Amino acid sequence: MKKHIAYVCADAGIPVFGTKGASIHVQSVVRAALKAGHRVTLFATRFDGHVPPGLENVACVHLPEIPQGDPTKRAHAALEARDHIAERLDAHAPYDMVYERYSLWSDVGMRWARKHGIPGILEVNAPLIEEQRTHRQLVLEDEARAVAQSAFSQASAILAVSPGVADYLHTWPGTKGRVHVVANGVDPSSSADSAEL
Protein backbone atom coordinates (compact mmCIF):
# COMPACT_ATOMS: atom_id res chain seq x y z
CA MET A 1 0.00 0.00 0.00
CA LYS A 2 1.30 3.43 -0.92
CA LYS A 3 2.31 5.45 2.13
CA HIS A 4 3.02 9.12 2.78
CA ILE A 5 6.35 9.26 4.60
CA ALA A 6 7.69 12.32 6.39
CA TYR A 7 11.50 12.20 6.30
CA VAL A 8 13.04 14.54 8.90
CA CYS A 9 16.70 15.63 8.82
CA ALA A 10 17.18 18.41 11.36
CA ASP A 11 20.98 18.18 11.31
CA ALA A 12 22.34 21.55 10.16
CA GLY A 13 25.58 19.84 9.15
CA ILE A 14 23.91 17.78 6.42
CA PRO A 15 23.02 19.48 3.13
CA VAL A 16 20.57 16.82 1.96
CA PHE A 17 21.06 17.63 -1.74
CA GLY A 18 24.84 17.83 -1.34
CA THR A 19 27.58 15.33 -2.17
CA LYS A 20 29.00 14.39 1.24
CA GLY A 21 28.44 10.86 2.50
CA ALA A 22 25.57 11.75 4.83
CA SER A 23 23.86 13.66 2.01
CA ILE A 24 24.10 10.68 -0.33
CA HIS A 25 22.74 8.44 2.42
CA VAL A 26 19.65 10.65 2.85
CA GLN A 27 19.10 10.64 -0.91
CA SER A 28 19.43 6.84 -1.02
CA VAL A 29 16.80 6.32 1.66
CA VAL A 30 14.39 8.70 -0.07
CA ARG A 31 14.99 6.98 -3.43
CA ALA A 32 14.28 3.59 -1.85
CA ALA A 33 10.95 4.87 -0.53
CA LEU A 34 10.03 6.33 -3.92
CA LYS A 35 11.04 3.12 -5.69
CA ALA A 36 8.71 1.22 -3.35
CA GLY A 37 5.88 3.46 -4.56
CA HIS A 38 5.62 5.74 -1.55
CA ARG A 39 5.24 9.51 -1.41
CA VAL A 40 7.90 11.40 0.55
CA THR A 41 7.88 14.85 2.10
CA LEU A 42 11.47 15.78 2.99
CA PHE A 43 11.98 18.15 5.93
CA ALA A 44 15.55 19.44 6.20
CA THR A 45 17.50 22.28 7.74
CA ARG A 46 19.78 22.46 4.70
CA PHE A 47 19.16 21.43 1.12
CA ASP A 48 21.98 23.16 -0.86
CA GLY A 49 22.47 22.55 -4.55
CA HIS A 50 20.07 21.30 -7.18
CA VAL A 51 17.54 18.54 -6.74
CA PRO A 52 19.38 15.25 -7.42
CA PRO A 53 18.14 13.02 -10.26
CA GLY A 54 15.21 10.88 -9.23
CA LEU A 55 14.08 13.18 -6.43
CA GLU A 56 12.22 15.71 -8.56
CA ASN A 57 8.83 14.62 -7.20
CA VAL A 58 9.78 14.88 -3.53
CA ALA A 59 8.03 17.68 -1.63
CA CYS A 60 10.72 19.71 0.17
CA VAL A 61 10.10 21.68 3.36
CA HIS A 62 12.77 23.95 4.80
CA LEU A 63 13.28 23.78 8.55
CA PRO A 64 14.50 26.79 10.56
CA GLU A 65 18.07 27.80 9.79
CA ILE A 66 20.64 27.39 12.54
CA PRO A 67 23.11 30.30 12.81
CA GLN A 68 26.83 29.74 12.32
CA GLY A 69 29.32 30.54 15.04
CA ASP A 70 29.24 29.91 18.77
CA PRO A 71 28.41 26.23 19.51
CA THR A 72 26.26 27.04 22.54
CA LYS A 73 24.18 29.55 20.61
CA ARG A 74 23.80 27.03 17.77
CA ALA A 75 22.66 24.34 20.20
CA HIS A 76 20.11 26.66 21.81
CA ALA A 77 18.82 27.70 18.38
CA ALA A 78 18.43 24.05 17.34
CA LEU A 79 16.56 23.21 20.54
CA GLU A 80 14.28 26.21 20.10
CA ALA A 81 13.57 25.19 16.49
CA ARG A 82 11.82 22.00 17.61
CA ASP A 83 8.41 23.66 18.04
CA HIS A 84 8.71 25.17 14.55
CA ILE A 85 9.60 21.77 13.10
CA ALA A 86 6.50 20.26 14.71
CA GLU A 87 4.39 23.05 13.20
CA ARG A 88 5.79 22.30 9.74
CA LEU A 89 5.03 18.62 10.20
CA ASP A 90 1.48 19.59 11.17
CA ALA A 91 1.13 21.73 8.04
CA HIS A 92 1.89 18.86 5.64
CA ALA A 93 0.11 16.01 7.46
CA PRO A 94 -1.31 13.41 7.40
CA TYR A 95 1.46 10.83 7.13
CA ASP A 96 1.54 7.08 7.45
CA MET A 97 5.01 7.09 8.98
CA VAL A 98 7.75 9.45 10.16
CA TYR A 99 11.36 8.53 9.36
CA GLU A 100 13.93 10.65 11.17
CA ARG A 101 17.70 10.71 10.85
CA TYR A 102 18.90 11.06 14.43
CA SER A 103 20.60 14.37 15.11
CA LEU A 104 22.05 15.84 18.29
CA TRP A 105 19.23 18.29 19.01
CA SER A 106 16.05 16.81 17.52
CA ASP A 107 13.54 14.30 18.81
CA VAL A 108 10.70 16.03 16.98
CA GLY A 109 9.93 13.37 14.39
CA MET A 110 9.64 10.60 16.97
CA ARG A 111 7.58 12.73 19.36
CA TRP A 112 5.28 13.78 16.51
CA ALA A 113 4.78 10.19 15.34
CA ARG A 114 4.03 8.95 18.87
CA LYS A 115 1.58 11.81 19.49
CA HIS A 116 -0.31 11.01 16.27
CA GLY A 117 -0.30 7.24 16.68
CA ILE A 118 1.79 6.38 13.63
CA PRO A 119 5.10 4.50 13.32
CA GLY A 120 8.24 6.49 13.95
CA ILE A 121 11.43 5.02 12.50
CA LEU A 122 14.69 6.48 13.83
CA GLU A 123 17.88 5.97 11.82
CA VAL A 124 21.03 6.22 13.95
CA ASN A 125 24.31 6.52 12.08
CA ALA A 126 26.72 7.20 14.94
CA PRO A 127 26.98 7.77 18.70
CA LEU A 128 26.68 11.51 18.15
CA ILE A 129 27.14 12.66 21.74
CA GLU A 130 30.41 10.76 22.08
CA GLU A 131 31.60 11.87 18.64
CA GLN A 132 30.83 15.49 19.45
CA ARG A 133 32.72 15.22 22.74
CA THR A 134 35.75 13.56 21.13
CA HIS A 135 36.09 15.34 17.79
CA ARG A 136 34.37 18.71 18.19
CA GLN A 137 32.99 20.55 21.19
CA LEU A 138 30.11 19.09 23.18
CA VAL A 139 27.95 21.79 24.74
CA LEU A 140 24.71 21.33 26.68
CA GLU A 141 25.45 17.66 27.29
CA ASP A 142 22.48 17.16 29.61
CA GLU A 143 20.14 18.52 26.94
CA ALA A 144 21.76 16.36 24.24
CA ARG A 145 21.31 13.26 26.40
CA ALA A 146 17.68 14.18 27.12
CA VAL A 147 16.99 14.59 23.39
CA ALA A 148 18.62 11.23 22.64
CA GLN A 149 16.68 9.44 25.38
CA SER A 150 13.43 10.98 24.15
CA ALA A 151 14.07 10.02 20.53
CA PHE A 152 15.22 6.50 21.38
CA SER A 153 12.33 5.81 23.75
CA GLN A 154 9.60 7.14 21.46
CA ALA A 155 10.72 5.47 18.23
CA SER A 156 8.70 2.46 17.08
CA ALA A 157 11.92 1.00 15.68
CA ILE A 158 15.54 2.15 15.69
CA LEU A 159 17.76 1.42 12.69
CA ALA A 160 21.48 1.17 13.42
CA VAL A 161 23.84 1.35 10.45
CA SER A 162 26.33 -1.08 12.02
CA PRO A 163 26.62 -3.61 14.84
CA GLY A 164 28.80 -1.12 16.72
CA VAL A 165 26.07 1.52 16.63
CA ALA A 166 23.56 -1.13 17.73
CA ASP A 167 25.78 -1.97 20.71
CA TYR A 168 25.87 1.72 21.63
CA LEU A 169 22.08 1.98 21.36
CA HIS A 170 21.65 -1.00 23.68
CA THR A 171 23.37 1.00 26.45
CA TRP A 172 20.33 3.33 26.53
CA PRO A 173 17.30 2.39 28.65
CA GLY A 174 14.27 1.03 26.82
CA THR A 175 15.90 0.18 23.49
CA LYS A 176 15.92 -3.61 23.88
CA GLY A 177 14.02 -5.38 21.12
CA ARG A 178 13.63 -2.27 18.96
CA VAL A 179 17.12 -1.94 17.45
CA HIS A 180 17.69 -3.40 13.97
CA VAL A 181 21.00 -3.33 12.06
CA VAL A 182 20.47 -2.11 8.49
CA ALA A 183 23.62 -1.05 6.65
CA ASN A 184 23.82 1.84 4.17
CA GLY A 185 20.29 2.92 3.51
CA VAL A 186 16.97 1.24 3.97
CA ASP A 187 13.65 0.72 2.30
CA PRO A 188 11.28 2.47 4.73
CA SER A 189 8.40 0.22 3.68
CA SER A 190 10.17 -2.83 5.09
CA SER A 191 11.18 -0.84 8.18
CA ALA A 192 7.57 -0.04 8.80
CA ASP A 193 6.81 -3.75 8.71
CA SER A 194 9.55 -4.41 11.25
CA ALA A 195 7.93 -1.85 13.55
CA GLU A 196 4.88 -4.13 13.65
CA LEU A 197 2.32 -1.84 12.11
Model feature map: region roles:
Residues M1-G54, A157, V179:
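N-terminal subdomain of nucleotide-sugar transferases
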Residues R46, G164, G185:
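Carbohydrate-associated surface elements
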Residues V58-E87:
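A short, charged, and often flexible helix/loop element on the N-terminal side
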Residues E87, R114, L128, V139-I158:
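Membrane-proximal helix-turn-helix segments that form the acceptor-binding/catalytic region
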Residues Y99, S153-S162, H180:
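A short beta-strand/loop micro-motif in the catalytic core of glycosyltransferases
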Residues E100-W105, V124:
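Short His-centered aromatic/hydrophobic patch
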Residues H170, G185-L197:
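Acidic anion/phosphate-binding donor-loop and adjacent secondary structure
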